[in-house]
């Protein structure tokens, strides 16, 4: 797989209706316990490895892998001995009246 550079990933995500794109860098052996976000995510792992648990299943992700999370989905994250970096395209929840 040809991994795009960040600017290309960002431009593609914004063209597909995402609101923002962020680079997330996690230190070695860190964890993010079960939580939710007020946005949906389409992400690309670019360095290291991580484990993402949602809907009762855990996925092992390495550089080049993608993952998606819908708005407010409970999930947990765990990062490998070298940490991990991923690019996350975020789509915020529509405003309510």
What are the residue ranges of the model-derived segments?
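Short, conserved beta-strand element in jelly-roll/cupin
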Residues: 36-52
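Ligand-binding loop in jelly-roll beta-barrel domains
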Residues: 71-97
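Conserved short histidine dyad/triad with adjacent acidic residue
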Residues: 20-37, 71-72
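Short, charged/polar surface micro-motifs in flexible loops or helix N-caps
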Residues: 28-29, 47-50, 93-94
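Short acidic-glycine-tyrosine-enriched beta hairpin
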Residues: 55-72
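Amphipathic, hydrophobic secondary-structure cores in small proteins
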Residues: 32, 37, 53-55, 63
């Amino acid at each position: 797989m040809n991994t795009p550079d960040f600017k290309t990933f960002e431009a593609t995500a914004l063209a597909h209706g995402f609101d923002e794109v962020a680079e997330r860098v996690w230190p070695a052996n860190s964890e993010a316990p079960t939580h939710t976000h007020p946005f949906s995510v389409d992400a690309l792992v670019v360095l290291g490895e991580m484990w993402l648990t949602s809907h009762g299943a855990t996925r092992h992700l390495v550089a080049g892998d993608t993952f998606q999370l819908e708005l407010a989905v409970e999930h947990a994250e765990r990062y490998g001995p070298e940490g991990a970096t991923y690019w996350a395209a975020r789509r915020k929840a529509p405003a309510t009246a």
